[in-house]
């Protein structure tokens, strides 16, 4: 199983979602901001099950990685990976946490300083 590097920092968590409350785009193939370089998403399932499908690229017909995450389990996904998820039961309840490399956080802090320096 993929592991989050020990020095990565937990930066945010989504709310807990079910099939009805999760953003629709999460169920479609996507490459989102949460999977940029240096960011590991961790999906945790509280009830039901979620299937993660990872793809080699935007156009691959078949996934190259499939992970079934059941209640009480979590899975870590690689940065920069095209993917989608499927809620496997009507009562599935899950959330996603994001862990970021310290250098990525520093880059973001430097960019904010430049943007907000008043010049």
Curated annotation (Swiss-Prot):
Q: Quote the protein name from its UniProt record.
A: Uncharacterized protein YeaR
Show the disulfide pairing.
none
SUPFAM superfamilies in alphabetical order? Clavaminate synthase-like (SSF51197)
- Kindly give the InterPro entries that the UniProt entry links to this protein: DUF1971 (IPR015392), RmlC-like_jellyroll (IPR014710), Tellurite-R_YeaR (IPR014510)
């Amino acid at each position: 199983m993929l592991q989050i590097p020990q020095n990565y920092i937990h930066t945010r968590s989504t709310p807990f979602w079910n099939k009805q409350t999760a953003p629709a785009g999460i169920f479609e193939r996507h490459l989102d901001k949460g999977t940029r370089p240096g960011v590991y998403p961790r999906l945790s399932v509280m009830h039901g099950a979620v299937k993660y499908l990872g793809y080699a690229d935007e156009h691959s017909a078949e996934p190259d990685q499939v992970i079934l995450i059941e209640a009480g389990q979590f899975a870590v996904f690689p940065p920069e990976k095209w993917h989608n998820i499927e809620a496997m039961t009507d009562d599935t309840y899950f959330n996603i946490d994001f862990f970021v490399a310290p250098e990525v956080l520093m880059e973001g802090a430097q960019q904010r300083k430049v943007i907000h320096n008043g010049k």
